[in-house]
């Protein structure tokens, strides 16, 4: 029981929950490099601010919904 009390009294780690520093030797983060193929760089997708919807877009969506509802409700 005294070991558990010591654990809880320590509080959260000061550097956060993620391991800091280089990865341990013998482990690859993206697998071993393949010979003859260049290593792929990570692809980052940049999300901009959402575009405002035009009146035409709104009307087309509304018409599609009305059409689908009419098809479903008629049967």
UniProtKB/Swiss-Prot annotation:
Record carries keyword DNA-binding: no
Pfam families per record: CYSTM
Keyword Metal-binding in annotation: no
Membrane topology: Lipid-anchor
Other facts noted in the record for this chain: Present with 13100 molecules/cell in log phase SD medium.
Protein name, as recorded: Lipid-anchored plasma membrane protein CPP2
Residues of the signal peptide: none
Keywords: Cell membrane, Lipoprotein, Membrane, Repeat
GO CC terms in record: plasma membrane
Main subcellular location of this protein, as a coarse class: membrane
Family: Belongs to the CYSTM1 family.
InterPro entries assigned to the protein according to its UniProt record, in alphabetical order: CYSTM_dom
Sequence repeats: 4-13, 14-23, 24-33
Ranges for region 3 X 10 AA tandem repeats of Q-Q-G-Y-Y-Q-Q-G-P-P: 4-33
Domain of life: Eukaryota
Coiled-coil zones: none
Compartment(s) of residence: Cell membrane
Region (Disordered) residue spans: 1-43
PTM comment: Palmitoylated near the C-terminus.
Encoding gene (name): CPP2
């Amino acid at each position: 029981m005294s070991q558990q009390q010591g654990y809880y009294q320590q509080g959260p780690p000061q550097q956060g929950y993620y391991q800091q520093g280089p990865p341990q030797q013998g482990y690859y983060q993206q697998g071993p490099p393949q010979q003859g193929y260049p290593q792929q760089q990570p692809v980052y997708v940049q999300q901009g601010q959402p575009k405002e919807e035009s009146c035409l877009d709104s009307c087309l969506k509304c018409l599609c919904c009305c059409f689908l509802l009419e098809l479903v409700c008629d049967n």
